[in-house]
Amino acid sequence: MNSYTETEFFVGDIPYQMYVQYYQPRPDQNSVPIVLLHGAFHTGTCFVKTPDNRQGWAVYLAKLGYSTYIVDLPGHGRSGFVPDLALMSYQRIINATVALLQQIGPAVILTHSMSGVVGWQTAKTHPKLVKAIVGIAPSPPADLLPATTKNSHEVFPEDRPRIQSREDTKKYFTNSDTFPQENFENYFCSLVAESARISNELRNVEGRGLYICHPEILYDIPICVITGDQDPRHPYKVDAETAIYFQGDFIWLPEVGLPGHGHLQMLEHGNLAIADLFINWLHSKGVI
C-alpha cells in the first residue's frame, strides 16, 4: 500500500464556495483523479472513516495509489455558512463541482444519493471533464420521475433548512444488517442541515427537478450504478432504470456476493469490498 499526503483548498465563489480535501498518493501514479461527492445531510467525512473507526474509501483509494478528492458540498461542513441554505439550489453545487474539475482536470465522479443529480448534470454540461460516473444508490434524473404535486407529504417548506430526524435516520439510512449499529450515535451526530429546495428539486416537485432530456450525451461516459438490497428508497427497479437510461451498468450487490447492504455503503461492514468492486469496474472500462 502507498503512503499519501493530505492538502486542503477551496473552489467556487463566496458564499457557495466548496471545501476540498486532496489525498495525494506517494509515489503519485498520475492516475485519473477520483472525486467523491457525499449525499444529503452528510459531509466528506463519510468517506474518511466509518463510525466504528474503520478505514474509509478516500484513505483506501489513496493507499492503492489513486489521487482522491473529497468535498464538503457548498453549505455543508467545512465549506462554511450559507445564509440562504434552505433556498440553495442544485445548480450551486453543480457550479462548484465544475469549478473543481476545471482546476484538477478530467476525473471519475463517485456520487452518493442526493449528489447523483450533480454527477448527471455535470456530465451533461461538461462531458469532457467526466471520465466515468460511479453512482452509489444515486438520485435519478428528473426525466425518470413524475412531477410531485405541491400538496404531497414529500414536499418540504423552503423557509427553513431540513434537519434529519433520528427516526428517519434509523428507517432509511442505518437500517441494514451491515451498518455498525453499536456506533449509531457517532454517526447520527455527524449529520448536518440540508437545503429544502434541493430536496424538492430531487423529488421533482412541480416539475422543478433537473432534466437530462438527451441522455445520449452521456452514452460515451462509462456509468455504473451500485445498489444494496436493504436500501428502502432504492429498490432494484428504480436504480436499474437509472442505469438503463444512461446505457450504463447496474450492480445489485447480492448478485455479486454482497448481501445486506443499505443506503450507506461507504460506512457499512464490507465497505472496502464494495470499493474493490467499483475499482475493478473502472479498470475494466480502461478508465484508471
Sequence positions of predicted segments:
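Alpha/beta-hydrolase
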Residues: L144-E241, G248-D249
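Catalytic active-site module of serine/aspartate enzymes centered on a nucleophile-bearing elbow/loop
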Residues: W252-I288
